[in-house]
């Protein structure tokens, strides 16, 4: 489950390492520009290139979506910047649980925009935390932390690029 470029590296790694990625969940296509042409999320683009089923719920809590997801009988869900909170019914669904890859050194900068806040606040370090998800917002048991030192000239864009590689 993921949406922006930050999540694409993780999806590619899963595919390249021969994991059986049977479906991808991403945000619905969004209209862009004056023509309001629908644009795929970066994660959907990668999934389509790899012939992976794509699910795009308006709301992750919708019962029809939850039931559709249940049909996959997944061992694990990997969540990277999906953009919606998952209900307990989804978190508890896979046999091995849900793993979240978050772009901060948790517990600092839970939720949205952690990369930008690390730069705005002038942090000396940032990183990527991999955790087992629970019902809270980025509050699950921490499994792995990858720490990186920020450059004095670090921008949100440069840190995004660095952390997306680390997170993959």
Specify the residue positions occupied by each region the protein language model found.
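Short beta->alpha connector loops
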Residues: 3-6, 58-61, 82-85
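Donor/substrate-binding cores of folate-linked one-carbon enzymes
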Residues: 17, 27, 76-168
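N-terminal Rossmann-like dinucleotide-binding module
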Residues: 1-34
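Amphipathic, non-transmembrane alpha-helical secondary structure
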Residues: 8, 12-16, 66-70, 88
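A structural microfeature
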Residues: 23, 56, 143-144
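Conserved beta-strand segments of alpha/beta enzyme cores
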Residues: 20, 51-53, 97
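N-terminal glycine-/serine-/threonine-rich beta1-alpha1-beta2 phosphate-ribose binding loop
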Residues: 27, 31-73
């Amino acid at each position: 489950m993921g949406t922006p470029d930050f999540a694409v590296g993780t999806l590619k790694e899963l595919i390249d390492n021969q994991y059986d990625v049977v479906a991808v969940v991403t945000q619905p296509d969004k209209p862009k520009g004056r023509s309001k042409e629908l644009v795929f999320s970066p994660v959907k683009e990668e999934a389509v290139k790899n012939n992976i089923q794509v699910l795009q719920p308006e709301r992750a809590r919708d019962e029809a979506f939850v039931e559709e997801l249940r049909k996959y009988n997944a061992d694990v869900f990997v969540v990277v910047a999906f953009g919606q909170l998952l209900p307990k019914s989804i978190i508890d669904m896979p046999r091995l649980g849900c793993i979240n890859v978050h772009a901060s050194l948790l517990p600092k900068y839970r939720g949205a925009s952690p990369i930008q806040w690390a730069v705005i606040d002038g942090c000396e370090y940032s990183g990527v935390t991999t955790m087992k998800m629970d019902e809270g917002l980025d509050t699950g048991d921490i499994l792995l932390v990858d720490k990186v030192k920020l450059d004095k000239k670090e921008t949100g864009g440069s840190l995004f690029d660095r952390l997306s590689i680390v997170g993959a």
